[in-house]
A protein has these predicted regions:
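Active-site-proximal beta-strand elements of phosphoester/diester hydrolases
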Residues: 14-18, 112-118, 144-150
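Cap/insert and terminal regions of metallo-dependent hydrolase folds
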Residues: 38, 45, 50, 75-84, ...
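Single conserved hydrophobic/aromatic residue that forms the stacking wall/gate
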Residues: 1-6, 10
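Divalent metal-coordination and catalytic microenvironments
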Residues: 18, 55, 62, 76, ...
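Metal-dependent catalytic neighborhoods of phosphoester/phosphodiester hydrolases
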Residues: 62-71, 213-223, 249-250
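Active-site metal-binding loops of divalent metal-dependent hydrolases
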Residues: 19-21, 56, 118-119, 149-151, ...
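Pre-active-site segment of Zn-dependent metallo-hydrolases
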Residues: 13-56, 63-68, 78-81, 123, ...
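Metallo-beta-lactamase
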Residues: 79-143, 224-243, 248-254
């Protein structure tokens, strides 16, 4: 199953991706979560078998969250250089696996994580592009899952589809975009192209609904994704509420527009 906060449970293994349960900023009064979206705290999380971090930006790697999960996390997989943060924050280096683009890590039990490119950047405060950013494919005994991370549209989506045909799930960025950022964040038209390139059975648009990092209306990404789903039902786009579980082994239909005000 997959929950909206990018928590997956597959074959009794719990996988958590880029968890941020606090502010997405080094300053507590910037990028605070929308009211009603902070449904979970790190203390609510069960033991995590695999923690995947796609890059080191504040809205994907949060000190307060990961340190509270430290004693309940079995393995961390991240791009090159990001493991330094985890070591500094007290994680056991033996439980940290850094990967470069094109590398992979076998985790046992039929689980393998593949590190692949993304078109983005990295940096925290004044440390720009000293660590790598990436997308990942998590291969399990029953599923192939693509984790797009952040980034603009490029040929890497088609490359991943050729290397990993018949993807079961794609988790794609959909939100916090701008024409000025089109090379580092996908625009709505780019999401459509990425969905077509990957050809995954199910697509979960994320990176929306919790923080305002761009100037577009907060619900615009959801409306665009819903329109894409209506235009192309075969795309398998799913837009669950935050925290709502979705069975990955079923083809559930698109839920109602939960983000709109109920009609009287």
């Amino acid at each position: 199953s997959l929950r909206r906060q990018r928590q997956m449970c597959i074959r009794d293994r719990r996988i958590l991706v880029d968890p941020v349960f606090e502010t997405a900023s080094p300053l507590p009064f910037f990028n605070r979560p929308f009211e009603g979206t902070d449904l979970y705290k790190p203390e609510d999380m069960p033991g995590i078998d695999l923690l995947v971090i796609t890059h080191d930006h504040w809205d994907h790697l949060d000190y307060g969250t990961v340190t509270k999960l430290r004693d309940r996390t079995g393995r961390v997989v991240c791009p090159l250089g990001v493991g330094e943060y985890f070591e500094y924050w007290g994680f056991d280096p033996q439980r940290i696996t850094e990967l470069d683009w094109g590398e992979q890590a076998a985790l046992g039990g039929g689980f393998t994580v593949y590190c692949r490119p993304a078109r983005h950047f990295s940096g925290r405060t004044f440390r720009a592009n000293r660590t790598l950013w990436a997308s990942f494919v998590v291969e399990t005994p029953s599923q192939r899952i693509f984790l797009g991370g952040d980034g603009g549209y490029d040929t890497h989506f088609a490359d991943v589809a050729r290397e990993f045909p018949n993807l079961d799930v794609a988790v794609l960025e959909d939100g916090q975009y701008s024409e000025d950022w089109r090379y580092i964040h996908m625009l709505p038209a780019d999401l459509k192209r990425a969905v077509e390139d990957l050809g995954a059975r199910r697509v979960f648009p994320v990176h929306n609904s919790k923080y305002a990092l761009a100037r577009h209306p907060w619900d615009e990404p959801l409306n665009n994704a819903a329109a894409l789903a209506a235009e192309n039902p075969e795309a398998g786009i799913v837009l669950p509420r935050i925290g709502e579980p979705v069975r990955l082994d079923r083809s559930d239909t698109l839920p109602g527009r939960w983000w709109t005000a109920p009609e009287n």
